Amino acid sequence: MEHRLWGGRFSEPTAAEMRRFNDSFRFDRRLADVDITGSIAWAGALAQAGLIDEDEYAALVRGLELVRAEFANGTFVPAEGDEDIHTAVERRLRELIGDAALKLHTGRSRNDQVATDMRLYTIGIARQLDRRLRDLQLALLTQAELHTDTLMPGYTHLQRAQPITFGHWCLAYIEMFARDRSRLRDAITRMRVLPLGAGALAGNALGIERERLTELLDEFDELAANSLDAVSDRDFVAEILFICALIGIHLSRLAEDIILYASAEFGFIELADAYSTGSSLMPQKKNPDSMELLRGKSGRLLGNVVTLLTVLKGLPLTYNKDMQEDKEPLFDSFDTLDLGLQVAAAALATMTVHPERMAAALDDAMLATDLADELVRRGIPFRVAHGKVGQLVRRAQTLGVSLRHLPLTEYQAVEPSLDAGVYAIFDMARSVAQKASYGGTAPQRVREQCRRWRTILVESEA
């Protein structure tokens, strides 16, 4: 039996294949809680407008809370005609409280109803993802605090560039995820615009005070000012999908670093067994699958953004059924990212760092810039100093020695002012300590930033 919210003008039942194509309850059932929250607020607005009496209002609220409880405890039983979450809730509500349920949809369209549901849902997932990102930042911060003095190669073009500290590397990703959190919080401000009361597209003619709805739904702090835009706007979904995709890109970059650093060729870190897998053929293998999946799943997050934007790009005002396609990309991105962030935080918290392998990867050529800086201190223009050091690097390569072991005569042949003091430059810890500008890799600056982030993440957000 069908329980459609429409159909009076139709003389034929919906074809079975059309129902399968059209119905969305199988995926939009996760909107049950926010749908019921919106319906309770709507019932309050109906009561205030005198469209239902106190007894009907009480029955609606009681029945809706019973339906909410059924969804929460897993006892809700779908019916064959449950086209979507709105139909399912109203059908079950009528079974529980009788014909009073028939008044709930007075003056309301599924267009403004689902727009409200989606805004409530996206607010909730944005906050959830913000919490997950904080957990990841804390895992990175703990590693940074342990390794403020741990030296490692820093890379550009995946080539050894200059020495840095592993703590500084961890802090870089904390900053990256901080921007993601800022974007989430900023997006929430645009989600908190209430479309309820806009009707199908033109507004409400039954005396509903929309201002009252913002009091009943305290997640919203302003009303949508144009009913046409209110029911057709899905910018907020596109925005959070983009933010999810960008978080995924940042996770992918983090994962790529860890995959490299965990390889035998680097050996800088080792992932815990709990976040690695093996090979069905090669007994010796320990694969960084947690990181590879983070890297791989970033692609589906990007795909979900494109999916929604493609749906929206050609839609005329106002609501169109195409908009039903906003939900699965959103739900998929949230599910993927919510679990991925948990895995990332746990994998980082439990990984083992090998400072000795990091130190062994350092080489004197990484201090070539320090040598150029020394020439600058002697009054030589940097571009000239750069060229002289390039000559010294080439000469060391020709002789098959490191810069540290290049004879003084070779140094003086390129720059006569150099003396034996030049060899003091070849001290990795000294080099790193000199990078003491704000935001630099010097251990004192890394410790300073660790304290800053500890205050932000633990004390300010406790």
From Swiss-Prot:
The keyword Transferase does not apply. The keyword Manganese does not apply. SUPFAM superfamilies: L-aspartase-like. Its EC number is 4.3.2.1. Its main location: cytoplasm. Pfam families: ASL_C2 (PF14698), Lyase_1 (PF00206). NCBIfam families: argH. It catalyses: 2-(N(omega)-L-arginino)succinate = fumarate + L-arginine. One of its GO terms (molecular function) is argininosuccinate lyase activity. Belongs to the lyase 1 family. Argininosuccinate lyase subfamily. It comes from the Bacteria. This is Argininosuccinate lyase.
